[in-house]
């Protein structure tokens, strides 16, 4: 009877389609965060160019940084991203067009040196986030005590109190319509989980969040620099996962899940740079980024196998909604010594707990109100520190180094909340820790152009949970990856 109960409720989980919701705090922080990306020079110096400026990619962080230009510039960048392993049939390496932009300078022909010196206009495309990530994890801490089915049982029992059954995939069918489940029935239409000996999990994510910025900047007296950028964004995020659990009753069930999000959005970025001492190259910068306002579309589905036999599939309908990222604030410092050395430092802050979901018409439904409350409870402010330096032993050759620290957006003991009326059959989540990025690079200048190379290594560890149980110990995982990139540029 246990096997038949498992079969029927699992079928309910994946075969009943609905156009309900799939968003939560884990997806929210995923869409709001950024990689270190841009030109190879920008990456090699850790992105710490907010006060130094002079790079096409800086319009995405401090729009005033393009005001440092005195000649026009065009650049295009390519990279290879390497995660070291594949999953779900996807490779662990991808080639990518990461950046392409142009900056046009207009000399105001003001020989006095006072007042407006240059007005610069530019446009730049780059990848804000590359979602390439692969995971393969053996879960060996269940010990005949824990199971995903206990979490499902809790959802079932909650839903029974509301005269619904089916949980996770759909709650629109009456519990009296079907009398079965993957769980042991308690005799009063309630459910209890079945302990598991072990489990296996595999996941692959891919796609990108790309941005295109249009920038305008001003150089006033070679001492004050102002800039603004308008950014448009395009999200294409894909997730595929596989979960297999072997119960103490000898039965094995498999879920293969897929989830896709597409969306577009826009923001405005404002920046200012000042050289407070006219005779000194020291400068500081200030930036404000508005939230990015997105319109998103989600779709997801699942396949079910029981003891290696195909059972059923289910695809949930598309659902449109709106999503708003946090405000972001930044300060930066920069200094140069002659034409041979430059150093920059930058700090950014965004409060992840202020992210917000809503219906397409802006209405804050009960579901989204609950998700927004969960975001406030489980996420926190995120701090980013960037430092970078450049050394030129000769005019044509540059050596660069950089470092980033990005704090975790998760509060201690954060967990994924799955509504009994949501479409998820994915119960897994990872509380990712701090990010450390290390960068190196070199550049070669020649008449009319340049070639830059950069290497980036990103290290991050996390606590992985296949499902939520207060007593379940996490499995340690990592998201380490490396990137090699090249930029080809032209000055005119």
Residue map of PLM features:
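Short secondary-structure boundary/capping segments within folded domains
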Residues: 34, 49-51, 57-58, 63-71, ...
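Asp/Glu-centered strand-loop micro-motifs enriched in Gly/Pro and often flanked by an aromatic residue
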Residues: 43-57, 87-89, 199-205
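Outer-membrane beta-barrel porins/channels
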Residues: 23-37, 42-43, 105-492
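Strand-loop-strand
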Residues: 81, 90-91, 435-437
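Bacterial Sec-dependent N-terminal signal peptides
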Residues: 1-26, 488
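Predominantly transmembrane beta-strands of Gram-negative outer membrane beta-barrel pores used
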Residues: 44-47, 60-66, 73-79, 98-106, ...
């Amino acid at each position: 009877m246990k096997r038949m109960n498992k079969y029927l409720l699992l079928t309910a989980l994946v075969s009943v389609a609905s156009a309900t919701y799939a968003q939560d705090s884990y997806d929210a922080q995923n869409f709001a965060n950024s990689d270190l990306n841009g030109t190879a020079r920008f990456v090699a110096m850790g992105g710490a160019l907010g006060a130094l400026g002079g790079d096409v990619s800086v319009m995405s962080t401090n729009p005033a940084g393009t005001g440092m230009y005195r000649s026009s510039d065009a650049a295009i960048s390519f990279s290879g991203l390497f995660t070291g392993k594949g999953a779900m049939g996807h490779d662990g390496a991808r080639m990518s067009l990461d950046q392409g932009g142009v900056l046009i300078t207009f000399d105001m022909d003001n020989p006095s040196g006072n007042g407006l010196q240059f007005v610069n206009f530019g446009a730049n495309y780059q990848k804000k986030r590359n979602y390439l990530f692969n995971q393969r994890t053996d879960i060996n801490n269940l010990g005949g005590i824990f199971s995903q089915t206990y979490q499902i049982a809790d959802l079932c029992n909650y839903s029974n109190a509301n005269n619904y059954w089916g949980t996770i995939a759909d709650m629109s069918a009456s519990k009296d319509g079907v009398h079965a489940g993957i769980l042991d029935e308690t005799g009063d239409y309630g459910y209890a989980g079945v302990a598991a000996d072990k489990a296996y999990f595999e996941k692959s994510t891919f796609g990108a969040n790309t941005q295109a910025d249009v920038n305008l900047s001003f150089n006033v007296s070679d001492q004050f620099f102002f800039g603004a950028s308008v950014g448009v964004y395009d999200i294409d995020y894909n997730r595929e996962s596989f979960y297999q659990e072997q119960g103490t009753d000898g039965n094995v069930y498999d879920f293969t899940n897929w989830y896709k999000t597409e969306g577009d959005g826009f923001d405005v970025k404002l920046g200012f740079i000042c050289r407070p001492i006219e005779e000194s190259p020291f400068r500081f910068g200030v930036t404000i980024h508005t939230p990015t306002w997105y319109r998103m579309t989600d779709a997801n589905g699942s396949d079910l196998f029981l003891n290696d036999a195909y059972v059923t599939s289910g695809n949930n309908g598309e659902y449109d909604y709106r999503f708003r990222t946090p405000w972001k604030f930044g300060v930066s410092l920069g200094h140069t010594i002659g034409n041979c050395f430059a150093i920059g430092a930058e700090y950014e802050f965004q409060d992840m707990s202020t992210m917000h979901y809503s219906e397409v018409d802006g209405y804050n439904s009960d579901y989204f109100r609950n998700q927004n409350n969960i975001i406030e409870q489980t996420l926190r402010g995120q701090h980013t520190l960037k430092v970078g330096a450049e050394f030129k032993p000769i005019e044509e050759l540059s050596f660069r180094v950089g470092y980033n620290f990005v704090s975790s957006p998760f509060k201690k003991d954060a967990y994924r909340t799955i509504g009994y009326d949501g479409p998820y059959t994915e119960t897994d989540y990872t509380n990712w820790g701090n990010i450390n990025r290390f960068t190196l690079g070199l550049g070669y200048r020649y008449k009319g152009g340049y070639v830059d190379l950069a290497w980036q290594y990103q290290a991050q560890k996390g606590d992985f949970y296949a499902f939520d149980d207060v007593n379940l110990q996490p499995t340690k995982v990592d998201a380490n990856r490396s990137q090699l990139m090249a930029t080809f540029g032209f000055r005119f």
